Amino acid sequence: MKIRSSIKKRSSGCQIVRRKGVLYVINKKNPRFKQRQG
């Protein structure tokens, strides 16, 4: 998982999710696009 200051959707399968006030990008098709905003 990459930790970035600004997260973007890198492909059409990416979804931006907010959990406990933290933004995440999850991608079931291509898990290497996972990101977290820090």
Curated annotation (Swiss-Prot):
The keyword Ribonucleoprotein applies. Pfam families: Ribosomal_L36. Belongs to the bacterial ribosomal protein bL36 family. This is Large ribosomal subunit protein bL36. The keyword Ribonucleoprotein applies. PANTHER family: 50S RIBOSOMAL PROTEIN L36 2, LARGE RIBOSOMAL SUBUNIT PROTEIN BL36B. One of its GO terms (cellular component) is ribosome. Keywords: Ribonucleoprotein, Ribosomal protein.
